[in-house]
């Protein structure tokens, strides 16, 4: 008689599933694990959002009534003042990731009320989880969406190697003090992590190597499992399908962009796509590099249409002679995003650091080649001159050349792009890897 397989209960924790790459990635993994049904059952626990059968929210576990709202407001104000005092010596940074409010004090109780065998952490900052509240009697999987888990205070360490030691004198804090905030937070993480059964997952080989070299995670169980996406949603469409969609699109700007992109060969300018959420304020997004590359192309008389989503014209000053610029604003509709990917001849992702970019994966799955710098996890997804172009790091001239190369080989490289994503990043492929990990840890 076959032995009954016990279902492994997984609680996946992320601050939200609606905004940001980490939330989208976490939700896709959650859905995938439940879909493949290989002995694992995932439930999500989020800070903000709407409660569903498989999604619990922190609000469900907070005290109800006006007294709590008022008390929470007062305590938050006090804690914010303390937080500002902590950060005041470090004027160079605007990072507020270590703020916490009264809600954090209810989290431990909320976690204890959940039934699970494995706790799966994703992105837990923004006043959500205090590491000292993590359970010491359960295996914890922590998927790295940036470097904060193994750094003192930094989400992106850039050229700093302090995380390989004990942090301190943090360049991102503008500090020369070896016992600065980054060192103090590092010590607290070290104290807590030594009590936890941590298993680290990195979506990219690059970040996994960084984690292995870090003083906080050295010697830990560190594995590489990529993020995933629904390749049935993010898929290529024919030119005729794009034209039909454009005719029924209520957004006049998007409709025009799609119609222009599908004109007969010789009439349509190549379409360069750029996603620019927070690009003006976040230098990590690499907008300065993109601007330099486009200026190089413009001086060469290169004609193209640049389509920007996620930012407005007032956010990004773009003015060229030969390259027209269209802003389509913030795109919350996934289907609309898919059509934009399909219309593009190339998507440019000029970020200065990347783990495993959702935008790159989504565009590749739609059959759109990528031009990006050869940094971080980009090389895991983009194969140079096969499904995109890996420009030399910080070399804007090479980035400009890569944009031209992607446009020239758009059809050929786009087909290879789609094939690579289906093979490595489809939901069932990735979910099975996580299901096997859960089973291993829950024995």
Locations of the language-model features?
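Conserved acidic donor-binding segment of nucleotide-sugar-dependent glycosyltransferases
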Residues: 384-385, 389-396, 404-410
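A short, well-ordered alpha-helix in the C-terminal region of glycosyltransferases
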Residues: 411-424, 430-436
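Conserved donor-binding/catalytic core segment of Leloir-type glycosyltransferases
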Residues: 252-256, 261-285, 291-294
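Carbohydrate-associated surface elements
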Residues: 206, 228
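Nucleotide-activated donor-binding/catalytic signature segment of Leloir-type glycosyltransferases, i.e.
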Residues: 310, 315-335
């Amino acid at each position: 008689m076959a032995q009954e397989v016990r279902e492994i209960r997984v609680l996946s924790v992320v601050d939200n599933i609606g905004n940001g790459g980490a939330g989208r990635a976490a939700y896709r993994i959650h859905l995938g694990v439940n879909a493949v049904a290989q002995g694992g059952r995932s439930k999500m626990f989020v800070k903000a959002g709407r409660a569903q059968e498989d999604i619990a929210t922190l609000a469900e576990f907070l005290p109800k009534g006006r007294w709590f709202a008022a008390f929470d407001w007062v305590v938050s104000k006090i804690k914010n003042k303390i937080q500002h005092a902590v950060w005041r010596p470090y004027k160079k940074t605007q990072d507020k990731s270590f703020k916490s409010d009264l809600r954090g004090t209810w989290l431990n109780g909320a976690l204890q009320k959940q039934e699970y065998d494995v706790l799966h952490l994703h992105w837990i900052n923004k006043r959500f989880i205090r590491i000292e509240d993590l359970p010491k009697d359960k295996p914890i999987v922590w998927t790295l969406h940036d470097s904060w888990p193994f750094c003192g205070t930094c989400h992106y360490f850039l050229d700093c190697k302090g995380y390989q030691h004990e942090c301190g004198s943090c360049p991102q804090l503008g500090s020369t003090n070896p016992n600065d905030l980054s060192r103090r937070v590092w010590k607290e993480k070290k104290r807590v992590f030594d009590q936890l059964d941590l298993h680290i997952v990195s979506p990219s080989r690059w970040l996994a190597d960084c984690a292995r070299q870090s003083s906080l995670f050295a010697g830990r169980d560190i594995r590489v499992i990529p993020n995933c996406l629904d390749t049935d949603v993010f898929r290529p469409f024919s030119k005729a399908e794009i034209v039909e969609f454009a005719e029924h699109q209520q957004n006049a700007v998007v409709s025009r962009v799609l119609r222009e992109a599908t004109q007969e060969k010789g009439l349509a300018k190549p379409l360069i796509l750029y996603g620019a959420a927070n690009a003006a304020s976040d230098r990590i997004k690499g907008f300065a590099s993109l601007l330099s590359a486009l200026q190089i192309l413009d001086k060469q008389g290169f004609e193209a249409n640049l389509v920007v989503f996620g930012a407005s014209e007032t956010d990004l000053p773009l003015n060229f002679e030969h390259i027209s610029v269209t802003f389509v604003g913030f795109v919350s509709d996934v289907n609309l995003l898919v059509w934009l990917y399909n219309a593009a001849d190339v998507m440019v992702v000029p970020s200065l650091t990347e783990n495993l970019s959702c935008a790159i994966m989504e565009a590749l799955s739609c059959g759109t080649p990528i031009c990006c710098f050869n940094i971080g996890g980009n090389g895991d997804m983009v194969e140079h001159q096969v499904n995109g172009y890996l420009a030399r790091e910080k070399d804007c001239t090479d980035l400009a050349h890569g944009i031209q190369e992607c446009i020239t080989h758009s059809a050929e490289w786009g087909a290879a792009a789609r094939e690579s994503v289906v093979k490595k990043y489809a939901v069932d492929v990735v979910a099975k890897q996580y299901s096997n990990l859960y089973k291993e840890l829950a024995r």
